Every structure is written in C-alpha cells, then in structure tokens.
Amino acid sequence: MAKEGYYVIRTWEAGDIGEKTKFFVPGKKPDGIPSRRQKNAIRKQEQNEYSALKMLARLIHANFTAKDLLLGLDYSDEGLERVLSWGRKNGLPVDSTDETLRNDAIREAAAHELDIALRRVKRELDKSGLELKGIYVTSDMDGVTGEIVRVHHHLIVNAGTEEAFLKCWEKFGLGGVSWEHLWENQIDRTRLAEYLLEQVRRVPDAKKYRSTRNLVRPIHKDRIVSTDNELMVPKGGKLIFRQEYENKMGLQSDFQNRRPQYIRYITPKALRRMEAEREKGA
C-alpha cells in the first residue's frame, strides 16, 4: 500500500546553470503555506541537495566565468618553515610522530597563512578599487593517488587579481603562484568543483572549502506537486545531466520505479544570450 505523501520540485538557478530535483515527502500535502512539521519533513528529504559538491558547483556557477582564474599557491622550503614556526608558537602538533595529528596541524597552520595572505591581497587590490572574490581549499593530498603531499592551496578568484597574489605570496618568500583561466568551453563547472574537493583530505569538523563573504549565494525555489511525472527541462533550455533519485524510504510504490528525478541544464536565458553574442560576433 502506498504511503500518503506528496512531491517537492526544488529549482536552483546559478549563473547559466539550472537544476531541478523532485523528491517524495511523506505526510499530508499542505493546503497552503507548509506547517513547521511539514517543513521539517521536507528538510529531511532534501539532504542530498546540500552535498558539498552541489553547493560548491552552484557557488562557482553564480560567481565566476571563463575570464576568471584557477589559481595555485605552493610553499617553498622557506615558506613551509614559516608555517611550521607559527604552528609551534601556537601549540599545534606540527612535529608530532603521529602522522594524522601532524598533517592536520600543518594544514591548520597553512590555512592561517593563507588567511594572512588574503588580507594582504585585499589591501593591495583596494589601491586599484578592485574587490577580491574567491573560493579556496587547503590541500595536503594528491587528488588522484590519495598520497600525502606538501601542503598547498587551490583558489578560484576573479580576473585581474593575479599580480596582487604574486606580490603578496611569491615576493614574501612563501612559494610559487600559478594560474590559468577557467575553461571557456565548460559551461557546467561541476567537474571543477569535483576537482577541488578531490584535493581535500577528510578532517572531522573541518570545512571542505571556504569563500569570501561577497559571493552571490544561490537560493532555491520549491513547488509542491502530487505526481511523480518525469522532470522536464524548461522550454528553450538544454539538458546537461540527468540522474535517478533513489528512494531510500521504500514506502511509496510509484517512487520505487526510481525514475530520473534530478536534472541539470543550461537555462533558456543563458542560451538566448549566447546566441545573441554569436550573432553579434558574426
């Protein structure tokens, strides 16, 4: 027997990318504004929407384009010693014989050094009236092999900031700075978000990534429906990815069909803009 319930279609728009997810919520369908209990029921079913990967990808889509930069900050021997010295002075076990404790402490000290460098960069950019926008991760792991490597940082930052990073990192003797523009032909930057998170070793209670406060934070819209019809891309949009939403509850017979209930697409307005740009450049 099917359990009483309803479906929620959650829509996100971040930059040129849209997403829709449809999930089942047990209980009586709201007549108007959902009650607190109904909101809590929705919240329990939406956990997959708040995965670090999806949230990071949305943040990238909403704030950065192909003109912006993927930037790397490495530590020289001198720069690493500076990190270790700060860690020792502040009681972090950077010299511990326990490898996990030592690596966690070094990563924490390096994150502190990055914070100092970012403040320098912001002051430098203030001179030219440019604001720093960025997302950054601190890594001590090879994302492919999983091996521990020298601590370093990966950042996505706005265009025009590379010289400030050179001045505030390399010229301070901390190490090297490298950068490249975000891939112009990659409208969907979910793979870039995956790449960044692959570099981050899991540490209890530690954030996987951080960002500047001035970024646009995408906000979702919810719509309640009664049926489990297949999600469709908005008219004029272009499908990028479709996957099945798995019913872990096993209580709604229709829902056990596990129809594709997550889609990611290029929004119609983005495609119209791209077409106008092509016509203008022709």
Regions found by a protein language model. Give the residues of each.
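Right-hand nucleic-acid polymerase module
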Residues: 1-149, 159-282
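Conserved, short, structured surface segments that act as functional micro-motifs
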Residues: 152
